[in-house]
C-alpha cells in the first residue's frame, strides 16, 4: 500500500483544460468526478469558511440518509456549482490536495467544467445572459439621454419590481450607474508623457497600456482617470488599446466557453502587439486580470500570444509595488502630524 502524503508541501500546479474534448462534457464522467471530489471535500472541510459552495455541500451530505456523498441526489450537485463564482480562494489558500497531490483536486476548474457542460446542454437563463452581455448593455445604456433614463429606472421601486418579474434581477440588488462619456473616450488622444521617456525596471517596462474593462469604462470611469493620474505622476506613460471588448469573464462564469474564445480572438492580437512594442498591460478589475493571467492560458494552452499577454499583464497594485521595489516611484512628501494623513 502506497503512503499518501499531505498536500500543499509543493507549489501547486494546474493542467490545461481540455474543453474541446467531448469527454469534458460527458454527463456520466462529470458526475463521477463531482462525486469523487465532493467526497474528499466532505472528509476534509478546511474550506468551510469560504464561499457558500462548501456549506451547501456539507449541509447536503449531513442531511442525507447515508451521511456520505453517495446519499446526495445528483440533481442537488448543481446547488453546489451555482454557489461557486470561480474566485480560486479554495485552490490558492485552503485545499491541501491540489496538484501535484495524487488526489488532483482543483475545485474551481471542476466547477467551471460543470458550468460549461450545463451551458452546452441547456444554455443560460435570461437574467444571466443579460447580466453577462456587458458590451451590449453598456453601449445601449451609455447613450447620452438613455443613460439618464436607465439610471433613474434602476432607482425606481416599481420598475425594479417589474424587472425582477421579467428578468429575475432582484429588486433590492444594487445596480451600477452608466456614464454617457466612457473612460476610453476620456483617455482618447495624445497623453502627457512621451513613451520614449519610459524607464524599464526588472519586472516592468515603465509604460502601460490600460485595458479599461467594462465596469471602469461604462460605470466608474473615474477609477481609470485616477489610476492614470497616479501612473503619470510616477513618470509612466499610458495608452489604451485601439479597440476593446469585454474580456469574457462574465461568459466564463456562465460556462459559455465559445464566447470566451471569441472575445480572446478580438482582444489578444492587439494586446500582443502592444506587448511587442514594449508596453505592460494593466486592467482595473481583478476578475479581468485573473482571466488574462490565468484562465486564458489554461483554456488556450498552445496559444503563444495568450502566453505573451499573460506574462505582461498586471494588477495595478502589483505593478505599482514592482515599480516601488525597483525605486521608480515618486515619493509623496507627506508631513506626518496629528490628523494630517488619513487612511
Task: Cite the ranges covered by each PLM segment.
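Generic N-terminal leader/targeting and pre-domain segments
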Residues: 1-25, 29-44
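Non-heme iron-sulfur electron-transfer modules
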Residues: 6-24, 49-85, 97-127
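Short cysteine clusters
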Residues: 41-47, 51, 84-91, 95, ...
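Immediate flanking context of iron-sulfur cluster ligation sites
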Residues: 28-43, 73-90, 205, 233-243, ...
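Glycine-rich, histidine-containing beta strand-loop boundary motifs that form or position
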Residues: 45, 55, 88, 94-99, ...
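A short, structure-level motif marking secondary-structure boundaries and short turns
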Residues: 22-23, 32-33, 66, 211-213, ...
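Iron-sulfur cluster-binding electron-transfer modules in prokaryotic oxidoreductases
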Residues: 105-343
